[in-house]
Amino acid sequence: MRLRGILFDLDDTLADSSGTEEVVWERVADVIDEHVDGIDRSELRRRYLDVLEGHYSELAAGRIDFVTFRRRRLADALSPWGEVSEELLERYIAAKEAIADEMRPFPDAVATVRALRGEGIRVGVLTNGPSRFQRRKLEVSGLGPELDAIAISEELGVAKPDPEAFEQALALLGTRAEETAMVGDSLENDVAGGLGAGLAAVVWMPGRREGELPPGAHLARELAEVPRLLGLAV
């Protein structure tokens, strides 16, 4: 069956967040320093990264919302030094969300999306994250108006890799699973999720990530490679 649609992940797939991570971390650490005494930044960062997976799995499963996710992650990371006040939580969230204003599309993102749409392919985004945060990224990066559909986990009420997230995104895109591909940087959320949802094809764009490409998936180093890998002449 001819491919009629493609769903892209947003962060580190269409838009580049790699250059913003250090900046945002420094902002977050500065905010914490102002509220909590005796912080060891290197230890704080280690703990901050270590506690991510456990809380994110709760978020992805829909058992907690993004505010709760951020509160619990920060509280766990800070537990050796003290408790998280409401003021600290608010300033922490503001510092985290400032990353949206730093987002830029990859150099070939807009051209690739336009080329695909020019060939009649419907193009959408399926992204995990808070609605306000992700929509701001799409606005700042200029990608929003280029898309046929935008599916954000907070709005869907379910996150990748749950098959229901893909089902809802397909409904917004107006295509069926067997005629739609998924492109993203996460082996779990995008590749395994897309395969599990029965999509026609999945493309892994690892960027700085490491992992083993599963059977049935394609590997792309740049967005411009995606159409060729999917057998599209654009």
Residue ranges and their predicted role:
Residues 33-39, 80-85, 142-146, 174-175:
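Short helix-capping segments at alpha-helix termini
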Residues 21-32, 48-52, 70, 74, ...:
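Hydrophobic alpha-helical core bundles mediating ligand binding, dimerization, or RNAP-core interactions
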